[in-house]
Amino acid sequence: DGLHRFFVGKNAKVRYVEKHYGEGDGRGKRVMNPTTEVHLEEGASMILEATQISGIDDTLRKTIATLAENATLEVQEKVLTTGEQNAVSEFVADLNGAGSSCNIVSRTVARDKSTQHFSSTLNGNAACSGHTECDSIIMDSAKVSASPQLTAANVDASLIHEAAIGKIAGEQLLKLMTLGLTEQEAEERIVSGFLK
């Protein structure tokens, strides 16, 4: 578990990259529950890139953000789960300042018997813009759920959510297989491109 707190001052810019990977001999459960708090002052901006590619058996990833006037936050999350792994991502952003904006994009792939849940809450408390998007590829016997929530407390708050869960299209596989790839190689190529 870890707690990361960012207090980004007026007109300051931060880019934070977080990559999680677990490995070991399989005798213990690899659990990672990071919490990230972001407090953006007037005109501040932050890009948060969070990637979890493999090896984490169980994770609860929480991101909480408050945005002041003209602050901007961009979150890019990429998650791959396999086996019986479980990944939960929770995002809450309070857009408190006029002109603030938040863009959350999560791209995930769930394989085997793994499970994933994505939840995002955008609270538009001022004239602001917010967008949350979750795109997931589901394979094998995996389970994926997405629950975006938008709350506007200002008539000039513009909030959008998008969620898509689906399998790899057969025609995509066929096209790559006609180029000489095996079905497994074609799947790997598609997953790699999706998470890029």
Region locations from a protein language model:
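Conserved beta-strand/loop scaffold segments within soluble protein domains that form the structured core
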Residues: D1-L181, V191-K196
